[in-house]
Amino acid sequence: MALFAAWHANAEKEPNERVVVAYVTAGKNDVPDPTVMTHINYAFGTVNETFNGVNIQDPDRLKMIVGLKQQNPKLKVLLSIGGWTAGRFSEMAATKENRSAFAKDCKRIVEEFGLDGIDMDWEYPSSSEAGISSSPDDIDNFTLLMKELRHVLGQDKLLTIATICTAQYIDFKNCLPYLNLVNVMSYDMSDPNKQHHAALYPSPISGYCTGSEAVEAHLKAGVPKEKLVMGMPFYSKGRRQDPGIDEFLRTGVLPEGYSHQWSDEAKAEYIANEKGEFVWGYETVRSLSAKCQYILDNNLRGGMYWEYSSDKTGEFRTVLSNMLLNSGPDQHQKRYMLQL
């Protein structure tokens, strides 16, 4: 109890500065610019085969990422454990012995690599949607896992989680005291053949959930704004089997009859076919600027994106950096914002 009380009191004193969280993946050769984000979540580590430790994908790349702190000493680097189809969580969290051993291995990795903390991306407790094992006890066991991780990591390390847009599968009331940030995966929120997977607001082209609805779901679940981080995708998604989209993805040229569209209702960019139907959703400076403005208007903690290397030109991450961390949008972004 003393450790928890001390950590909670310390957390109350920490300044709630705006954050930009970038997921940076293994298996790539790019070197991230450490000046355009506050946090890097390195993806991924996984639960090991004996349910009591962590395997790290491409540990040499993780070492390189940590080395970026020399250029930006304020940069926080975390190991993200999990990801879609990453299993063994249910078995690991099921027993006190496994939870304790797993948490101790996380601490070993944090100390060995010089990390600032751990990000947990279990998709999802009590769900086998991703083809992983699950149990009705997972939600309670997840809370126990967060408690153990906080106890073992101590009060000076970061503990964050990634969550589904609907705020399901997590007992936030009991988890939140142990967490620094909640990264909401406000993308993949539709049948991509029919709707935009990451619209900001409800509209005819929006999916079953939107960015604004994801935020509201988490606020309703009790997540305070100072811990709430809204996710954004740096990738496009849609009706891949559509012949016009197939041609577009191969050549970069839209066939006759297809057009780029902006939904002012959804604050989202998309491609429509010759019938005016949605076929492909994507992000632009304009749509990301709208999401950043939403974060600012609603006083959320910040923005998160998946993932760094998908932004080939760097203009997407520059939007988040300028709007959320610096003085505001540059002239290029202002031109789009006048249309919002």
Predicted stretch roles:
Residues 81, 227-294, 319-340:
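Glycan-binding loop/region signatures in secreted carbohydrate-active enzymes
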Residues 33-42, 98-122, 173-189:
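Structural recognition of alpha->loop->beta junctions
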Residues 17-18, 36-38, 73-77, 114-116, ...:
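Short, well-ordered coil/turn segments that N-cap beta-strands
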Residues 35, 63, 100, 104-112, ...:
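Solvent-exposed, polar/charged alpha-helical surfaces in well-ordered, non-transmembrane soluble domains
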Residues 40, 79, 120, 149, ...:
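Conserved, mostly hydrophobic/aromatic
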Residues 21, 49-60, 104, 125-257:
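Substrate-binding surface in catalytic domains of secreted glycosidases
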Residues 12-110, 197, 204, 329-337:
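Glycan-recognition patch characteristic of GH18 chitinases/ENGases
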Residues 2-15, 295:
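N-terminal signal peptide
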